[in-house]
Amino acid sequence: KPGHRVMPDLVGRKFTANEPNRVYVGEVTYLPCKGGKNMYLATVIDTYSRKLAGYALADHMRVSLVVDALAHAHGVRGSLDGAVFHSDHGSVYTSQAFRSYCSSLGVRQSMGAVGTSADNALAESFNATLKREVLRDRKVFDNPIACRQEVFRWCMRYNTRRRHSWCNLVAPDDFEALTSATLTKAA
């Protein structure tokens, strides 16, 4: 498409970072509701702690959805200057508007190869976990409002209370607090 550009892969399936706020991954996933409607969730996940630093949920998959998710992460982190944001080749991520927004924040874009979920495995895994834990045995949300409420509740719990194997079985927020204290002492 005119104005769309694929960016190089700066992550190379290494979904780690030495400190918070350096490397993020994200993706858009659909959340099915009764009546055939979908909601769409865009995520921004820190590879250091697996913290969901930003997200946006809407009934559309326009560029504003991923811009809102990155804006949320910017608000949570205070700055994203110098960070890498890794995604797939979705048109919302290759768009001029998203590229410009990343540039305005000092974020470098990174993209995996086409057609391989392994190149964004961390974001894919997050979405699978969210759907499994929120929907449980259901196939769809009752309605968009219920979807928003349940996803919001789960996202808040994910960062503050859900233990994560990557984080030595503590929640992402606790992991960052513990490791930032260690990093400060080491400096």
Segments the model singles out, each with a brief description of its role:
Residues 1-187:
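Charged DNA-binding/catalytic regions of mobile-element recombinases
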